[in-house]
């Protein structure tokens, strides 16, 4: 069984395209094209389910048409309308010394600690709706929005899923 902390969201399936089972896919990260992985993970009825990719083709820099194995008709493809799509983290450079981070969404589920303020909480969401990407960090029922900026990150421990930051005064 695939767990939420083993994947990160990369987009959403929109609607069927044509009659042969292709699905329109809006993505925030093209990791599926850059990393060798034969499947995508879909969230269906609260369960993460892998689906093998037969083929895909880009329509723009944020949309693609995806053909999944076993999905051969528009009726079958329609079942994927508005389904969230995830990518398995194990295919992303998990080596301790690797700095290859595909997207800010990768950090969802990481604990965050500040070198001056201690533990800040856990990243529960990423707001990338503006040019300034924000981490939504939750601790004790309270939410803190923190800029997701490489200059603030002092240490990354992928095994412990811990992000150490040094945030300028006034942002916390």
Swiss-Prot record:
Coiled coil feature spans: none
SUPFAM superfamilies (UniProt xref): PRC-barrel domain, Translation proteins
Intracellular or extracellular location(s): Cytoplasm
Predominant cellular place of this UniProt entry's protein: cytoplasm
Cited function: An accessory protein needed during the final step in the assembly of 30S ribosomal subunit, possibly for assembly of the head region. Essential for efficient processing of 16S rRNA. May be needed both before and after RbfA during the maturation of 16S rRNA. It has affinity for free ribosomal 30S subunits but not for 70S ribosomes.
Similarity remark: Belongs to the RimM family.
Domain notes: The PRC barrel domain binds ribosomal protein uS19.
The protein's name in its UniProt record: Ribosome maturation factor RimM
Organism: Phocaeicola vulgatus (strain ATCC 8482 / DSM 1447 / JCM 5826 / CCUG 4940 / NBRC 14291 / NCTC 11154) (Bacteroides vulgatus)
Taxonomic classification: Bacteria, Pseudomonadati, Bacteroidota, Bacteroidia, Bacteroidales
Name of the encoding gene: rimM
């Amino acid at each position: 069984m695939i767990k939420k902390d083993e994947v990160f969201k990369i987009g959403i399936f929109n609607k069927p395209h044509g009659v042969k089972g292709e699905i329109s896919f809006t993505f925030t990260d093209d990791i599926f094209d850059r990393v060798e992985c034969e499947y995508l993970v879909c969230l269906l009825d609260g369960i993460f389910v892998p689906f093998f990719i037969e083929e895909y083709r880009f329509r723009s820099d944020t949309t693609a048409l995806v053909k999944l194995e076993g999905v051969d008709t528009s009726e079958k493809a329609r079942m994927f309308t508005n389904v969230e799509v995830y990518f398995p983290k194990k295919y992303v450079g998990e080596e301790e010394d690797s700095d290859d981070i595909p997207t800010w969404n990768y950090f969802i589920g990481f604990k965050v600690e500040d070198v001056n303020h201690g533990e800040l909480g856990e990243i529960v969401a990423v707001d990338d709706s503006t040019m300034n990407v924000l981490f939504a960090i939750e601790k004790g029922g309270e939410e803190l929005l923190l800029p997701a900026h490489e200059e603030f990150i002092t240490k990354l421990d992928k095994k412990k899923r811990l992000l150490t930051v040094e945030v300028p005064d006034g942002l916390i």
